[in-house]
Design a protein with these regions (language model features):
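A short beta-loop-alpha structural element at the N-terminal edge
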Residues: 1-18
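Active-site rim helix/loop that mediates acceptor-substrate recognition in acyltransferases
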Residues: 28-47
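Charged interaction scaffolds used for protein-protein
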Residues: 45, 52-53, 153-156, 165-167
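Conserved beta-hairpin
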Residues: 45-64
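Conserved acetyl-CoA binding element of GNAT-fold acetyltransferases
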Residues: 71-85
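Conserved acetyl-CoA-binding loop-helix of GNAT-fold acetyltransferases
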Residues: 87-101, 122, 126
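Conserved beta-strand-loop-alpha-helix junction that forms the acyl-donor binding cleft
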Residues: 109-125, 137-139
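Conserved catalytic-core motifs of GNAT/GCN5-like acyltransferases
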Residues: 112, 130-145
């Protein structure tokens, strides 16, 4: 599959909001809450990137917002459609390019990932993120891994140095 990475548009975000699993509970309890929460997350982000397939359909979003207590650290988030279940290497490569670009703005990217999301943790580890041992996240009370990536620790090239199209 061929993908193109560009800054996300409102149409990309709207499409992904509609494509979200209404039973996931991650972004709210119903489709309206999912869309509202995704829109708020995008609005607070300094960068939001979209991957589109060769038909121009959005299939992934990545974003980063400054951490509230340290604006040099970016709180990274991502959302991907099911097609990447069969194409994990493509998603890993796309993610690496986007995260490298984000590290041009932030000295570190981090977030907390629920321990039950083993595939997400392994994806982030494979890109170069450090995965800390599981601990209870104080804000949510959920057992999470802190995942983080420092600017000097990326194996990927920036979007400016690589083609934004992945074959």
């Amino acid at each position: 599959m061929r993908y193109c990475i560009q800054h996300a548009t409102s149409a990309d975000v709207a499409f992904m909001a509609l494509a979200m699993d209404p039973d996931s509970g991650e972004w709210g309890s119903n489709e309206t809450e999912h869309a509202d929460r995704l829109l708020m997350t995008c609005a607070s982000s300094t960068q939001v990137w979209a991957a589109r397939d060769n038909a121009g359909t959005p299939c992934a979003l990545w974003g980063v917002a400054p951490k509230s207590d340290d604006e040099e650290i970016g709180c990274v988030w991502l959302l991907a459609c099911e097609q990447f279940e069969q194409e994990p290497a493509d998603f890993r490569n796309l993610s690496g390019m986007v995260f490298a670009e984000m590290l041009g703005e932030y000295v570190q990217l981090e977030n907390f990932v629920d321990v039950r999301k083993e595939r997400a943790v392994e994806l982030l580890r494979s890109i170069g993120f450090t995965v800390d041992p599981a601990a209870t996240h104080s804000a949510s009370g959920t057992l999470c891994h802190r995942v983080w990536l420092e600017a000097g620790n990326t194996r990927s090239l920036s979007l400016a140095e690589r083609s934004a199209v992945l074959n």
